[in-house]
Design a protein with these regions (language model features):
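A structural "domain/chain start" motif
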Residues: 19-101, 114, 213-217
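Surface-exposed short loop/turn segments
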Residues: 94-169
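Sequence contexts marking disulfide-bonded cysteines in secreted/extracellular proteins
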Residues: 20, 61, 138-140, 147-149, ...
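Short secondary-structure boundary motifs at beta->alpha junctions and helix caps
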Residues: 144-212
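Short, solvent-exposed beta-strand-terminating loops
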Residues: 72, 77-78, 131-133, 171-183
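Solvent-exposed, acidic/flexible segments
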Residues: 50-58, 98-102, 153, 193-204
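A mature extracytoplasmic/lumenal domain signature
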Residues: 46, 78, 125-128, 164, ...
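Sec-dependent bacterial lipoprotein signal peptides
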Residues: 1-19
Length: 217
């Protein structure tokens, strides 16, 4: 293969890989309202119930929602957990909306939530996982230099759901979801160049957009 052909093939690889597909959905169960002086809080599912939603994903959604709107406040997850310790730690927090009365039955907790005007708790579940992978890279060094050759790829799926709970009504008012699939690849002709689908960051963007849109509807 000529040098020009190799370059053409490499450009083609850059164009066709590292892509992702995003699907978002929204479900509204009952009427809801929120004002500018009220807050929402995001919590992840517990590691006791399976795979815990990644910490960096939770931080991404918290930050993204804060930047996208000024219609309501968002209390950072870790700050909320510290203020209400130990009631909303991963091992003790309610895992379903049916568990809310167990926590809100504590008058001290309920009064503090009311004083801080925390109206909605958003329970985020999901994870990013690799579905399939293949290929191989080989790197070597010699007297004339070194390099890597080969081709590797993997498919990732990032699927997350946010269940929105009204703390005053102790009920779920809706759900939003983001599902992102993508293929990442690393072609190597002397120098390996990762081309990443970044499904988790795209899922963060999609889910935060859906949450903001939910409260804007």
């Amino acid at each position: 293969m000529t040098s020009l052909s190799k370059k053409a093939l490499f450009v083609l690889v850059l164009l066709v890989v590292g892509c992702s597909t995003t699907r978002v959905d929204e479900e509204i169960n009952s009427a809801f309202t929120i004002s500018s002086d009220e807050s929402i809080v995001l919590l992840s599912n517990s590691y006791h119930t399976g795979n815990q939603t990644e910490l960096d994903f939770m931080e991404c959604v918290n930050s993204s929602i804060s930047k996208k709107q000024n219609a309501f406040d968002i209390l950072p997850t870790r700050q909320f957990q510290n203020l209400f310790y130990p009631w909303f730690e991963p091992s003790t927090a309610p895992q379903t909306v049916e568990d809310l009365p167990k926590v809100l039955g504590n008058d001290l907790i309920k009064e503090k939530l009311s004083q801080m005007k925390i109206k909605y708790l958003i329970k985020i579940t999901g994870q990013t996982k690799t579905n399939a992978s293949s290929g191989a890279l080989s790197c070597a060094a010699g007297p004339g230099g070194g390099g890597c050759f080969g081709f590797a790829w993997w498919d990732d799926t990032s699927e997350y759901t946010a269940s929105i709970w009204d703390l005053s009504q102790e009920t779920a008012v809706g759900n939003v979801t983001a599902n992102v699939t993508g293929t990442s690849m690393i072609p190597a002709i002397v120098i390996p160049i990762p081309i990443l689908a970044r499904t988790q960051s795209n899922a963060c963007e999609g889910l935060s957009n859906q949450i903001v849109s939910f409260f804007s509807s």
